[in-house]
Amino acid sequence: MFTQAAKPLLVLHALTAMALLGATTHLVVVKTLRWRGRPRERLEQMYSRLIAPLFVGAFFLGLTMYPHFRVDVRARNLDANQPWASNLFDFKVHLAAIGVPLALGLFFLGRRGPAARPVTDLFAVTLWLIVAWSVVSGLIITSVRGV
């Protein structure tokens, strides 16, 4: 089952990750505008709410593909021939797991207004770095050996 669904799931995972990268990038840009005295409250709230479902969706799609990846891609190819790609994947997955509470925190704290801004600013920038790293490293790993 996973073998037949792996490629469409990988494409959906990549598209969701790209949308997530766009949303986190836009949130950081909007927050930067606020730091410079040009607040965009509605955009900041919208991106804060959009990021959590995108993050959870991308994470869930990755988890769905993991059994196929682990057996058919990693065990048969990457571990033996490209161990650096296996290590990069492990780092990517662990870093993405750290992003889950940050994305959920943005979702819930993003509505609280000025009192929560220092926390949401930190969450947004950190999450943007995690997502950017995960997208780039995911593309590198897939270019070595995709599903």
Regions found by a protein language model. Give the residues of each.
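Polytopic transmembrane helical bundles with strong interfacial aromatic enrichment
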Residues: 1-147
